[in-house]
């Protein structure tokens, strides 16, 4: 087969592919028959479908995945989303949800904050979310400091956060953990959080009602 014939064959193939592409775009040969939502733990999948704007039966190739993703990521629990086509008839929607860390009671309800310090919802806090009390609304540094503490505790042992009843934090330098069993652990400032989390895991195994781990190398009890 000489070069001229090869060129003709390639040209024909290119034209056919282009024609098929145009036909697939304007004629709904492949339709959306199924929309799969994964990663929706706290987000209602039906709500995801509704805001996505994608409907079953529409042309698969004309689905605006970018616009759908932009709409979905506006839902409160959604941190990020990926929308893809899966031939012959499926749209996949993969969610990554925000992880709640703390909540704080305000006049308009409980404000649930994620591990990055962003407010998720005003409503019922999920199980395992730690309450923060005493924080000055005008001090923007308190909640990030407390969240850094909670993240360090989770990294050391996630079960330890479940034993915290409330965190009292009038400011970012004066953090006190009140435990479900009545014990108190004074954390102090949001510094050396890893070392303090290690110290916390140790003191929780010992007797004593009031522990001070603000200096993790010199833990005291009274």
From Swiss-Prot:
Gene3D superfamilies: membrane protein fhac. Its main location: membrane. It holds the Pfam family POTRA_1. Residues 27-222 are extracellular. Keywords: Cell cycle, Cell division, Cell membrane, Membrane, Transmembrane, Transmembrane helix. It comes from the Bacteria. It is found in: Cell membrane. The keyword Cell membrane applies. Residues 1-5 are cytoplasmic. It is a single-pass type II membrane protein. Residues 30-98 form the POTRA domain. The chain crosses the membrane at residues 6-26. Essential cell division protein. Belongs to the FtsQ/DivIB family. FtsQ subfamily. This is Cell division protein FtsQ. It comes from Corynebacterium glutamicum (strain ATCC 13032 / DSM 20300 / JCM 1318 / BCRC 11384 / CCUG 27702 / LMG 3730 / NBRC 12168 / NCIMB 10025 / NRRL B-2784 / 534).
């Amino acid at each position: 087969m000489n070069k001229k014939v090869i060129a003709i064959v390639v040209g024909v193939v290119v034209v056919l592919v282009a024609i098929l592409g145009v036909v697939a775009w304007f004629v709904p040969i492949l339709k959306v028959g199924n929309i799969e939502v994964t990663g929706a733990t706290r987000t209602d999948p039906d709500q995801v479908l509704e805001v996505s704007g994608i409907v079953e039966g529409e042309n698969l190739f004309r689905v605006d995945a970018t616009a759908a993703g932009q709409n979905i990521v506006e839902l409160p629990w959604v941190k990020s989303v990926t929308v893809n086509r899966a031939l012959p008839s499926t749209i996949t929607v993969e969610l990554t949800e925000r992880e709640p860390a703390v909540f704080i009671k305000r006049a308009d309800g409980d404000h649930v904050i994620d591990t990055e310090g962003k407010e998720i919802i005003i409503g019922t806090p999920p199980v395992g979310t730690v309450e923060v009390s005493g924080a000055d609304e005008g001090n923007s540094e308190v909640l990030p400091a407390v969240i850094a503490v909670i993240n360090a505790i989770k990294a050391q042992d996630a079960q330890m956060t479940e034993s915290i009843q409330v965190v009292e934090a009038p400011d970012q330098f004066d953090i006190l953990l009140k435990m479900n069993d009545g014990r108190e652990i004074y954390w102090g400032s949001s510094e050396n959080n890893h070392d303090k989390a290690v110290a916390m895991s140790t003191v929780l195994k010992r007797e004593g009602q009031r522990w001070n781990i603000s200096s993790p190398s010199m833990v005291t009890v009274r």
